[in-house]
Curated annotation (Swiss-Prot):
Segments forming domain S1 motif: 623-691
Reported cofactor(s): Mg(2+)
Pfam family, one: RNase_PH_C
Top-level taxon in the UniProt lineage: Bacteria
Subcellular location(s) per record: Cytoplasm
Reaction(s) this enzyme catalyzes, per UniProt: RNA(n+1) + phosphate = RNA(n) + a ribonucleoside 5'-diphosphate
The protein, known as: Polyribonucleotide nucleotidyltransferase
Entry keyword set: Cytoplasm, Magnesium, Metal-binding, Nucleotidyltransferase, RNA-binding, Transferase
Function: Involved in mRNA degradation. Catalyzes the phosphorolysis of single-stranded polyribonucleotides processively in the 3'- to 5'-direction.
Ranges for domain KH: 554-613
Length: 713
């Protein structure tokens, strides 16, 4: 019934198994990949023909984590997996980025890759395994695909590279880098690092590339016995059309691409495009080519013109040389009632970035397959359509916004203070108000400025820069601070963020094969110079974090209480803590380890709450004198509240030095009295005395007498 095939290798100390032919047999390609005991199912289906009028390649990648994979049931009311989580979105992009460039130009059939995590051993992250499984499924499917692709994670622990570290090892690593590529070239890099230099980062990329070669060999071995017959696909030859169009439009296109201002340049290019369409798509008579074909060839021609200009003249669209960064203006404190704010403008790319400080209640709970955890640093990136002068959908963030926000988050996080140093939840929102390339790196710069404006003690300022590449045969040019057009028409998008001393985040997407180690080295070195230049420009606005928080930011005081006292502070059903919050006005957050965070904009409210909690958890000392309040009287004595919520009995014999007939002869409810803690009885009940304390002065009577006797002698 089943025509099963599998291949198994030892990879970084664990078995990797790729199996096909048993599950999802109606898909064009399906592979179950197992690494350790983590398992994913990858499937791929591609339509047999493109939709009429399709002018782009409709590739969709869906990565999904099933909670049953970790033996869990989804939380929430419906108990069913819902919309994709942030991680699912990010891993979908991670799979998409290295495989997209390997489909042949002109292939426009609807293609969908679905990767499902069906088992998680809580040791091996399924993201890299999902890349491998998707690559294998595509290679077996017969769909036109110039793979296979391999992928690996690289850590850096105690000065050594580690291939595919376990999840628990990542806490020790100063690097989390995922790299993907073919046998000959690197196609994609995604990383977070703790201020590592360019040499270490480049070494990690090459280490990972070498490390996943056995995986590519395994996929090829499986394909030799299990791959379907390749589909016939022959891209159409439009060279004649391109040559004719070049003769018609080259001069005007070259002139248009010398216009430095984006809107004017786009208008000039559109005018040339209109002329070209009018020539090849006459109103009368039958057109030789379709509008989609004319548009695709014109776009190809645009790329050629821009690339030729750069390689021939070393001058770019806006007149800059290869390494010059656009003019930068940095401002902080632009929204004085917010906790921290910045406006970062670089050329025609601009971001308003706002930082907000919150308490432990504001932390985001994340329910992942590996367990529930809390995130205290949030960064949200918004890209409204007006930022590029267009209309469009407004609503929940798309994949691109989530991905760009996470890239900036990775860049900033290594420089944040620890929760012990700065016990605030941090939320940063980046509103992209203008965009002409590198808005994610503008977000990095703006976030650094806004956090410093808010008084968050960043270890060092962070800046980011986007690099580009144009490669034609042996000739190449590395571009600093690329424009949107240079991104679309170039061969590489290489984003580098970090401090003056090292890299904190690196993301690379390469659209062609053949990027060498030498080119990557040049790009990293050029990016370092650009990054330091940007940091210098940012320093014109602010050089280090402000010494104090803004006027409208909450203040937080941290105290620690014994774990066995947490119940007393919270009270039955939360009664005690609710009363403290209501009467003092402060916000209180209690961790399981006894850490208490008290937050308020008022120092008086914080102090009142702190004293209240201290009175609950502290223990009264035997022999000490306390001021208290009579809360109840009885025939045998009076109950006095003398220490926080703690009451104790003053026996009738301890009310006064003379004999007392009735308790009410000496005290009544509500009286303020001085008491001495004499000790505890065998049941732990408090024993208090009033008669040994002078009720007028609060001093011990016995001590006064001794002092008088000593003076008389």
């Amino acid at each position: 019934m089943f025509n099963k095939h599998s291949v198994e290798i030892e990879w970084a100390g664990r078995p990797l198994k790729l199996e096909t032919g048993k599950v999802a047999r109606q898909a064009d390609g399906a592979v179950i990949a197992t690494y350790g005991e983590t398992m994913v199912l990858a499937t791929v289906v591609s339509a047999k023909s493109p939709k009429p009028g399709q002018d782009f390649f409709p590739l969709t990648v869906n990565y999904q984590e099933k909670t049953y994979a970790a033996g869990k049931i989804p939380g929430g009311y419906f108990k069913r997996e819902g919309r994709p989580s942030e991680k699912e979105t990010l891993v979908s992009r991670l799979i998409d980025r290295p495989i997209r460039p390997l489909f042949p130009e002109g292939y426009k059939n609807d293609t969908q890759v679905v990767v499902t995590v069906i088992q998680h051993d809580l040791e091996n992250d399924p993201d890299v395994l999902s890349m491998v499984a998707a690559s294998a499924a595509l290679t077996l499917s017969g769909i036109p695909f110039m793979g296979p692709v391999g992928g690996a994670r690289v850590g850096y622990i105690n000065g050594e590279y580690v291939l595919n570290p376990h999840l628990d090892e990542m806490d020790e690593s100063v690097l989390d880098l995922v790299v993907a590529g073919t046998q000959d070239a690197v196609l994609m890099v995604e990383s977070e690092a703790k201020e590592l230099n360019e040499e270490i980062m480049l070494g990690a990329v090459m280490f990972g590339h070498k490390g996943f070669q056995p995986v590519i060999d395994a996929i090829i071995k499986l394909a030799e016995v299990a791959a379907k017959e390749p589909r016939e696909f022959e891209p159409e030859d439009f060279s004649a059309l391109e040559n004719e169009m070049l003769g018609l439009a080259e001069t005007e296109l070259r002139t248009a691409y010398k216009i430095t201002e984006k809107a004017a340049r786009y208008a000039a290019v559109d005018a040339v495009k209109t002329k070209v369409k009018a020539h090849f798509l006459p109103e009368e008579g039958e057109a030789k080519y379709s509008p989609e074909e004319i548009g695709a060839v014109f776009k190809h021609l645009q790329a050629k013109i821009v690339r030729w200009n750069v390689l021939d003249t070393k001058s770019r669209i806006d007149g800059r040389d290869l390494s010059t960064v656009r003019p930068i203006v940095s401002e902080v404190g632009i929204l004085p009632r917010t906790h921290g704010s910045a406006l970062f403008t670089r050329g025609e790319t601009q971001a308003i970035v706002v930082a907000t400080l919150g308490t432990g209640e504001d932390e985001q709970y994340v329910d992942s397959l590996t367990g529930m955890y809390k995130e205290r640093f949030l960064l949200h990136y918004n890209f409204p359509p007006y930022s590029v002068g267009e209309t469009g959908r407004m609503g929940s963030p798309g994949r691109r916004e989530i991905g760009h926000g996470k890239l900036a988050w990775r860049a900033i996080r290594p420089m944040l203070p620890t929760a012990e140093q700065f016990p605030y939840t941090l939320r940063v929102v980046s509103e992209i108000t203008e965009s002409n390339g590198s808005s994610s790196m503008a977000t990095v710069c703006g976030t650094s400025l806004a956090l410093m404006d808010a008084g968050v003690p960043l270890a060092k300022p962070v800046a980011g820069i986007a690099m580009g590449l144009i490669l034609e045969g042996e000739r190449f040019a590395v571009l600093s601070d690329i424009l949107g057009d240079e991104d679309h028409l170039g061969d590489m998008d290489f984003k580098v963020a970090g401090t003056a001393d090292g890299i904190t985040s690196l993301q690379m997407d390469i659209k062609i094969a053949g990027i060498t180690e030498e080119i990557m080295k040049i790009a990293l070195e050029q990016a370092q110079g650009g990054r330091k230049h940007i940091l210098g420009e940012m320093a014109n606005a602010i050089t280090e974090s402000r010494g104090q928080l803004g006027e409208f930011a909450p203040r937080i005081e941290v105290m620690n209480i014994p774990v066995d006292k947490i119940r007393e502070v919270i009270g039955s059903g939360g009664k005690v803590i609710r009363e403290i919050v209501e009467k003092t006005g402060a916000k209180i957050n209690i961790e399981d380890d006894g850490t208490v965070k008290i937050a308020s904009a008022s120092g008086k409210e914080i102090e009142a709450a702190r004293k209240w909690i201290h009175s609950i958890v502290a223990e009264p000392e035997v022999g000490q004198i306390y001021e208290g309040t009579v809360v109840k009287t009885a025939d045998f004595g009076a109950f006095v509240n003398f220490f926080g919520a703690r009451d104790g009995l003053v026996h009738i014999s301890q009310l006064a030095s003379e004999r007392v007939a009735k308790t009410s002869d000496v005290v009544k409810e509500g009286d303020k009295v001085w008491v001495k803690l004499m000790g505890f009885d065998e049941r732990g009940k408090v024993r208090l005395s009033m008669k040994v304390v002078d009720q007028a002065t609060g001093k011990e009577v016995a001590a006064d007498k001794k002092d008088g006797e000593a003076a008389a002698e």
